[in-house]
């Protein structure tokens, strides 16, 4: 296990993956335009050690997670392919994905909707190309953490964020995000979404969730 400390977007000290981490941070900041974040990355070597940090037995597809608002647990690049179902080349996108979560928690200061945080992370990390099988899930029922556990709408969330950006522009999405509370309620989100996009999220999200990958 190795620990890497980042303060105000800068990696402190030496590490074999220092440049990769700095590149990942810059990719996240570049998308949002501004912001400074401070956090730690714990590079894990074994599945047993990773599961211990998570607090349960983990699946082999799980390769990184963020806890609190300032710690990322991630399999070390040298063992990434050996201990997970992911190719070594996806170490970087997984790193970016988790840094997006740090940014949304620390700088944007919102947790709900979960589908929004996950969709953003996928889009910014350019992980949509890694989605092997698109799974239709109702993102209107993926707002709270407990809903997400029953309805982990990863691929639908990613494609919906991508759709919003391409159809309406990134500025509208940023306007929505910057107006969110930390624990945004569903009703409040629906109102804010309609103010920005002039359409009901329940309607738009539901319709989008029912489409197949070929219809998106």
Residue ranges and their predicted role:
Residues 23-27, 99, 160, 192:
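Amphipathic alpha-helical segments that form well-ordered structural scaffolds
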């Amino acid at each position: 296990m190795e620990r890497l400390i980042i303060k105000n977007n800068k990696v402190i000290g030496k590490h074999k993956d220092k440049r990769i981490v700095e590149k990942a941070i810059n990719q996240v900041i570049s998308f949002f335009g501004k912001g400074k974040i401070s956090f730690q990355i714990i590079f894990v070597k074994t599945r047993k050690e990773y599961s211990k940090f998570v607090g349960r037995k983990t699946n082999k597809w799980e390769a990184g997670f963020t806890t609190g608002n300032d710690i990322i647990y991630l399999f070390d690049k040298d063992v990434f392919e050996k201990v997970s179902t992911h190719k070594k080349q996806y170490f970087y996108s997984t790193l970016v994905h988790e840094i997006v979560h740090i940014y949304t928690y620390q700088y944007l200061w919102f947790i709900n909707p979960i589908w929004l945080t996950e969709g953003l992370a996928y889009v910014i990390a350019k992980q949509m190309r890694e989605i092997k099988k698109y799974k239709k899930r109702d993102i209107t029922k993926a707002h709270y953490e407990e809903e997400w556990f029953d309805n982990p709408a990863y691929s639908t969330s990613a494609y919906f964020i991508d759709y919003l950006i391409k159809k309406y522009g990134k500025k509208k999405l940023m306007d929505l995000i910057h107006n969110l509370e930390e624990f945004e309620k569903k009703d409040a989100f629906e109102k804010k979404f309609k103010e920005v996009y002039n359409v009901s999220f329940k309607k738009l999200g539901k319709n989008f969730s029912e489409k197949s990958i070929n219809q998106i």
